[in-house]
Amino acid sequence: MALTPMMRQYFEIKENYKDCILFFRLGDFYEMFFEDAETAARELELVLTGRDCGLEKRAPMCGIPFHASNSYIGRLVAKGYKVAICEQVEDPKVAKGIVKRDVIKVITPGTYTDSSFVEETKNNYIMTIYSDLERNRCSLAITDISTGDFLATEGELEKGVILDEISKFNPKEIILLDSLDQELIKDITLTTPALISRKPIEYFEEKFEEVLNSQFGEKSNSLSLMIKKSSNALVKYILDTQKISLTNINDIEVYSLVDFMTIDLSSRRNLELTENLREKSKKGSLLWVLDKTETSMGSRMLRRWIEEPLVNKEKITLRLNAVEELFNDLSLNDSLKEALHDIYDIERILGKISNKNANAKDLIALKTSIGKIPNVKGIIENCTSSLLKNYHHNLDDLRDIYELLEKSIKEDPSLTLKDGDLIKDGFNGEIDELRLAKTNGKDWISSLENREREFTGIKSLKVGFNKVFGYYIEISKANYSSIPEGRYIRKQTLANAERFITPELKEIEEKLLGASEKLCSLEYDIFLDIRNEVENHIDRLKTTAKIIAELDCISNLAFVALENDFIKPEINEDGETKIENGRHPVVEKVIPKGEFIPNDTIINKDDNQLLIITGPNMAGKSTYMRQVAIITLMCQIGSFVPASKANISVVDKIFTRIGASDDLAGGKSTFMVEMWEVSNILKNATENSLVLLDEVGRGTSTYDGLSIAWSVIEYICKNKNLRCKTLFATHYHELTKLEGEIHGVRNYSVAVKEVDNNIIFLRKIIEGGADQSYGIEVAKLAGIPDEVINRAKEILETLEMESSKDNLDLALKEVNASKEEMKEASIEASYEVKETIVEEDKIEIIEEIISKSSDAKTHKKEDDQIQLDFSAIGKDNLIKELSEVDILSLNPMEAMNRLYALVKEAKNLI
């Protein structure tokens, strides 16, 4: 059997859009067939039917009304599908044979612009990634077609670089080079929910000069080859999906990866910059506190500022000074916010104009917005800060565009462009004439109705109109007997009435409909001319929109600072940050006012480089560390900060390792995830970075974890290429011994008060390490049953009594294992039981220490007695040195530490 002509046409079109659900226009419906129909029926909960198609079996089919298509398209796109819109591209009345059809647009997650599904305050980005394996380089291009933003960058071909940029922009769609490393593709897939497509190298490399020159003109000539190729693929993809060149995408913003603070995916999540960890919503994030902007453009800009803090001191200072000027003039800032309030989303209106789908109401919104600009400009006219002066100087009042729209478009125009009622009286003479004819015709219709009522005596007679039957005279059945014979021609029969026409009414109908059709057509054409004229000035409009967005951000930061008692920070590049009475801006917002406990911070490249913070769970260690990072970040976006005084050293990167969970999809355990994050930090942090490390090593055995944490601290402080400013929270109290041992390490703890066997968290960071973790007390606060709490105390007491013997036995095994390593192969893990051969004199020494260590707690510790100098110890006198340890001055844990040090030295001497 042969396919029907319509089905043959369907398959010819579908062949070019295999990765899309094809919406095939048939009359007033979009129909889907075969697999597309099955998918759409399942996802949209539509009834799946069938249609004869010329094959043995009917084609599965489902459909939706074209006038309700937006909601269905939005639901499919939100689920990650692409939708190809296939329209009838010729009038069925004049078509010879089957009506011509073609795809007029492909709608994808990254190119969907319908306001019902795109968040006003978030960009809808699409990204392309190009890689050059030989040069080990990559480039990325990013755009939001609804706003016209187009950015590009390049850097080393490293997983971290790519994943960081993906986490920053959070694109809805990513186009990858299909030869990209498979492991990297897997990591990208696990990192983002974006729809991922893969394209051959030709898609990136062919005709890039031609494509970019057509889109950007001479501006593209100065781009690097790498950026040209990623940008080429992105522009091609836009052309492939939108089927037109978008004029609002007219410039490329090339940025360097070092222009902004680096914040990796883990840190963005842990710091909750734009969404909270639990619900993934804005509430509870830093953006939630800071965003009191007046415009959608300003809100998107502020989000971008938070995602991309500055690292240039001069640029930060420019923003801070502008915020300060508005902060100090409350009346001025109130006036500015009021003026900004009525400005619509100019960027997205321009996106609609560029995409040829802006209606008359969009142009009225644009006119209203432009009309506010002179007032905005006047408000900041006398400002003295450099940034505000620049805004005033560069702000175009767009008077010519305002006047065009003011005299041309009706204030309350029709939503449908082809239904007329768009253009103001007096703008076009021909439109005025047609309207007069239409008005006269309607007056004639009204007079006809009155005449016929008088002639027939039927008071309920009326003259009406509908698009199917045109004009008619309607008489109810109750008045049939009053109808003069031969006066009317029957046109339509209803249940309770009859509709008629007269030759005279038919004649005027033709004149009226002719005038109406011509009027609607003429208004549509003139509207397109006006819209095109506005589009010719899209460069000016985009520049103005950007200034308004930035001005909104500055005004907003001044308002938020006043509302939340923030202060202007000082900035330095000396490596030292001092914060007095710092507060966490989000936490203080969600707890009762006045209950947040502020804390001081001093962190630098010298004696306060790595702060070891100890204290019980729930005491506030993590909040404090996040607070320091967020205050630093706020300063670098140009915001005032929550403190009484702050002098912030500019940081190039913020890293956090706070909390972890299994990465089951990636095949990584909690501990593996933790170690991967620590590894990433140690490889990429610099001396100008800020690092937050929380409970490093807790995902494995106690001694393995302690060893790793200890080693990480040493590496950070002693590696001259690293030495980053670090906040290190831990429950390993043994690490507090590193103060004085390693330059730059300082101990801090969270103050706790004990009252009647209960603990009170004071939330205050104080100098010195904590002497216990209060784990059982925290468990009690969490509601663990008393029976469990009491038993835990008994077990803890027993373990503390036995800890010395157990730990020293463990150390003894390591000493003997080190001896065996010289003779045979490497040893098993330190916590495994194994037989060892020990010389009798060694056994006697160790047993003596074990027998006496349980009483050691009663002896006072003197720091100078427990410091050992191993620099001159050799193999021959190692045992002698061990025997000389003054066990009476050591408690059990200190004895363990000393033996661990001896074991380490023994291994080094092998």
From Swiss-Prot:
<comment type="function">
    <text>This protein is involved in the repair of mismatches in DNA. It is possible that it carries out the mismatch recognition step. This protein has a weak ATPase activity.</text>
</comment>
<dbReference type="Pfam" id="PF05192">
    <property type="entry name" value="MutS_III"/>
</dbReference>
<keyword id="KW-0238">DNA-binding</keyword>
<keyword id="KW-0547">Nucleotide-binding</keyword>
<dbReference type="InterPro" id="IPR005748">
    <property type="entry name" value="DNA_mismatch_repair_MutS"/>
</dbReference>
<dbReference type="InterPro" id="IPR036187">
    <property type="entry name" value="DNA_mismatch_repair_MutS_sf"/>
</dbReference>
<dbReference type="InterPro" id="IPR007695">
    <property type="entry name" value="DNA_mismatch_repair_MutS-lik_N"/>
</dbReference>
<dbReference type="InterPro" id="IPR007861">
    <property type="entry name" value="DNA_mismatch_repair_MutS_clamp"/>
</dbReference>
<dbReference type="InterPro" id="IPR045076">
    <property type="entry name" value="MutS"/>
</dbReference>
<dbReference type="InterPro" id="IPR007860">
    <property type="entry name" value="DNA_mmatch_repair_MutS_con_dom"/>
</dbReference>
<dbReference type="GO" id="GO:0003684">
    <property type="term" value="F:damaged DNA binding"/>
</dbReference>
<dbReference type="GO" id="GO:0005829">
    <property type="term" value="C:cytosol"/>
</dbReference>
<dbReference type="InterPro" id="IPR017261">
    <property type="entry name" value="DNA_mismatch_repair_MutS/MSH"/>
</dbReference>
<dbReference type="Pfam" id="PF01624">
    <property type="entry name" value="MutS_I"/>
</dbReference>
<dbReference type="Pfam" id="PF05190">
    <property type="entry name" value="MutS_IV"/>
</dbReference>
<keyword id="KW-0067">ATP-binding</keyword>
<protein>
    <recommendedName>
        <fullName>DNA mismatch repair protein MutS</fullName>
    </recommendedName>
</protein>
<dbReference type="GO" id="GO:0005524">
    <property type="term" value="F:ATP binding"/>
</dbReference>
<comment type="similarity">
    <text>Belongs to the DNA mismatch repair MutS family.</text>
</comment>
<dbReference type="InterPro" id="IPR036678">
    <property type="entry name" value="MutS_con_dom_sf"/>
</dbReference>
<keyword id="KW-0227">DNA damage</keyword>
<dbReference type="Pfam" id="PF05188">
    <property type="entry name" value="MutS_II"/>
</dbReference>
<dbReference type="InterPro" id="IPR016151">
    <property type="entry name" value="DNA_mismatch_repair_MutS_N"/>
</dbReference>
<dbReference type="Pfam" id="PF00488">
    <property type="entry name" value="MutS_V"/>
</dbReference>
<keyword id="KW-0234">DNA repair</keyword>
<dbReference type="InterPro" id="IPR007696">
    <property type="entry name" value="DNA_mismatch_repair_MutS_core"/>
</dbReference>
<dbReference type="InterPro" id="IPR027417">
    <property type="entry name" value="P-loop_NTPase"/>
</dbReference>
<feature type="binding site">
    <location>
        <begin position="615"/>
        <end position="622"/>
    </location>
    <ligand>
        <name>ATP</name>
    </ligand>
</feature>
<dbReference type="InterPro" id="IPR000432">
    <property type="entry name" value="DNA_mismatch_repair_MutS_C"/>
</dbReference>
<dbReference type="GO" id="GO:0030983">
    <property type="term" value="F:mismatched DNA binding"/>
</dbReference>
<dbReference type="GO" id="GO:0006298">
    <property type="term" value="P:mismatch repair"/>
</dbReference>
<dbReference type="GO" id="GO:0140664">
    <property type="term" value="F:ATP-dependent DNA damage sensor activity"/>
</dbReference>
